[in-house]
Design a protein with these regions (language model features):
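Mature, soluble, non-transmembrane domains
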Residues: 110-225
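N-terminal secretory signal peptides that target proteins for export/translocation
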Residues: 1-14
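N-terminal signal peptide c-region/cleavage motif recognized by signal peptidases
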Residues: 29-31
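Structured domain cores in non-transmembrane regions
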Residues: 66-144
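Early extracytoplasmic/domain-onset interaction patches
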Residues: 37-69
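Sec-dependent N-terminal signal peptides
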Residues: 20-27
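A short catalytic or substrate-binding loop motif that flags glycine-/basic-rich loops and adjacent residues
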Residues: 36-38, 213-214
Length: 225
């Protein structure tokens, strides 16, 4: 994957470059195609520590059919999907680079931004249809009290990658104290003028630090009594 052709440091860009996928992807779809270019279906689990604090998020990111097809190209035997072991180098490449982009996960409590540690429990799996899912646990740098509302969003600021929560069971709670609940605030639809901006030229001219993806990001809120 690549946010922009001029930004090869993106974690998914490295995967595409290593597997020579970018050329094939854009030859098939046309380089002028508007953002996004990659779609990810998200399921997240808010993980609580034994003391009742929120300790992290466990993500499952299911990639779209086109990315999955390129990711597993040349892997697997006898028509079977590749194993976790075969996909492990690809998982390692992706996750090692995610820190630079804050793991595409932005959490807050009381208006303060929360930081994460390096991901653990990393696996990459391909199902019987060769759809690829990246799973990992993202621990908070410091666990936080569940008695104050905790929120998070999963999105790509440059909107090269579209992250969308699954319709069914998008967010669950693990080991949560009694009475905890989870809700979601959906983003407002883009107005007509904003939709017209979604050209490749618009995104290539982004200034450093620009954040378009937040406009389309669902905010998940966890509240406990």
């Amino acid at each position: 994957m690549t946010f922009r052709f001029r930004q090869p440091s993106h974690p998914f860009t490295r995967v595409f470059l290593l597997r020579a996928l970018t050329l094939a992807l854009f030859a098939a779809s046309g380089a002028a195609r508007a953002h996004p270019h990659v779609w990810v279906a998200v399921r997240s689990e808010v993980v609580f520590a034994p003391d009742g604090k929120i300790m992290g998020l466990r993500h499952a990111w299911e990639f779209d059919e086109m990315y999955s097809a390129f990711a597993v190209q040349g892997l697997g035997k006898d028509g079977k999907p590749p194993t976790r072991e075969e996909l492990a180098p690809l998982a390692k490449t992706n996750v090692e680079s995610l820190a630079e982009f804050e793991f595409f996960t932005f959490a807050k409590q009381g208006g303060a931004k929360l930081k994460f540690l390096e991901p653990t429990e990393v696996t990459l799996e391909a199902d019987e249809k060769n759809i690829v899912t990246l799973r990992f646990l993202l621990p908070l740098q410091t666990p936080v009290s569940a008695q104050k509302p905790f929120s998070f969003q999963v999105y790509d600021p440059t909107y090269f990658v579209s992250f969308n929560f699954e319709k069914q069971n998008p967010v669950t709670l693990a080991r949560a104290p009694d009475g905890c609940s989870v809700s979601a605030v959906e983003p407002k639809p883009l107005v007509a003028d904003e939709n017209k901006k979604l050209s490749e030229a618009f995104f290539q001219n982004f200034s450093p630090g620009a954040d378009f993806g937040i406009k389309l990001a669902t905010r998940v809120i966890v509240a406990c009594p």
